[in-house]
Amino acid sequence: MFIKASLDKSKVVKIRKKYGIPKGNITYTDLDKPAKPLFSAKHKLVGKPDYIVKRKEGHIPVEVKSSSVEIPYKSHIMQLAAYCLLVEDVYNAKVPYGIIVYGDRQFKIPYSNILKTRLIITIDEMRNCLRTNGRLKEKA
């Protein structure tokens, strides 16, 4: 039992170092083994962040990307925002920010009301596009 606990701790330390995952309790991981998807009935949204870290300030979703970039892609920010929304709903928890890890750097993305609103609008637009077979609504 002691050896297994030590190996698990050693593995966690390596994962944290490799991906720059902040200190805190890792409550969810999908990167090193498949995990059950998170589902928000309220927003009809499903997703699997790579990690969720529970810290004093709240739950922090972490998304790991294989590419290296100077600034985060807008699509990756929206993906992270979706994970923030899922964590907020599923865990009924405060989500102050999320983290996107690219190669040797990471970006802390604040989960603001503006980002949440932009995400919900984008989800609504995507659903409308699916309902109308890709046709956009005409603006008055």
Language-model features, listed with the residues they occupy:
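N-terminal signal-anchor transmembrane alpha helix of single-pass membrane proteins
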Residues: M1-K18
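Short hydrophobic/aromatic-rich motifs at helix boundaries and adjacent loops
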Residues: S6-D8, I21-K23, K54-E57, V95
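Active-site metal-binding core of divalent-cation-utilizing nuclease and nuclease-like domains
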Residues: G24-K56, S75
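Metal-dependent nuclease catalytic regions and adjoining charged, substrate-binding loops involved
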Residues: D32-V46, D89-A140
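Conserved catalytic cores of phosphodiester-cleaving nucleases, focusing on short active-site segments
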Residues: L45-E70, Q79-L85
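A generic structural signal for short coil/turn motifs at secondary-structure boundaries
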Residues: V69-Y73, K108-P110
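A short, polar/proline- and glycine-enriched secondary-structure boundary/capping micro-motif
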Residues: I71-S75, L119-I120
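Metal-dependent nuclease catalytic cores in nucleic-acid-processing enzymes
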Residues: S75-Y97
